[in-house]
Amino acid sequence: MSDSRLRRRQGTAGTDNKRRADGPHDISGLLDGVSVVLLDIEGTTTPITFVKDELFPYVCSHVRQHLEEHWKEEECQEDIAALRKQAKEDKEMDGVVLIPECTTKDDDEEARKKVLSAVVDNVLLNMDADRKVTALKQLQGHMWRAAYQTGKIKGEYVKLTFADVVPAIRGWLETGRQVYIYSSGSVEAQKLLFGFSTEGDLLELFSGHFDTTTGLKVETESYRRIAKTVGCDPANILFLTDVVREAKPSREAGMKTCLTVRPGNAPLTEEDWANYPVIKSFSELACDVSPTKMRSRGKAAT
């Protein structure tokens, strides 16, 4: 590298570091006109390690036990049927584990064991691939619910939210905004997480929840459905997520989008920093002006 190029790079190092830390986008007006804040969970409201290091391992280590204990229950059989159906749809995928047919009335213990083993293998394979299919998320939610009810997972075990999350949400609510959750985890799992928080039951903070039954988070149409369901123009919805593959379709649907940088999250690329507003804390989005007043102020200015 030439001396002149080196001097230019050294001269801009401070600017580059500031841009990486704060991003090139002005976030001061990000809440302008926003009536609904839509939140991702993992890596946004909640440490990514909580889900990956605590909840997911619980499912992996207890799925066989859960199936054995709840085998004759209708809900368990519905979970198995959903996984079986998904496996059939995935039959062209490498390594897919198909699940044999079997009912609770089947007296063949060997048949039951084969089904149980196939379900376990299927679940572990899908989790290893980090699949977001509804059948898997449904079973996970039911397992976590049972774990909470039996004390296998206790309330104090759930250090759910970053410290800036609840104060920011309360502030948004006070200024007339609504807050919704959109996560790959089932709605039931979402409610367990926020209902058993160390900060108490936080469910009252949310106007509603969305999961993969609405659509995959990487599909533009999913965000259009959410906007229609909440009765809000996409332009008046702000979606916060740590995943660019989710930010892109939400923006394509017309929503405002902001990426979150949290400890343990995957690093953003230079392109990500350039293309999206980025925050490290919800406190950066504090606002004391209601969306209605903000919109009327904008009309007056024109």
Curated annotation (Swiss-Prot):
Top-rank EC class of the record's enzyme: hydrolase
Binding site for substrate: 183-184, 217
Region span, Disordered: 1-25
Cysteine pairings via disulfide bonds: none
SUPFAM superfamilies: HAD-like (SSF56784)
Basic residues bias spans: 1-10
Highest taxon of the lineage: Eukaryota
Annotated cofactor note: Binds 1 Mg(2+) ion per subunit.
EC number: 3.1.3.77
Family designation: Belongs to the HAD-like hydrolase superfamily. MasA/MtnC family.
Listed name of the protein: Enolase-phosphatase E1
Species: Branchiostoma floridae (Florida lancelet)
UniProt lineage: Eukaryota, Metazoa, Chordata, Cephalochordata, Leptocardii
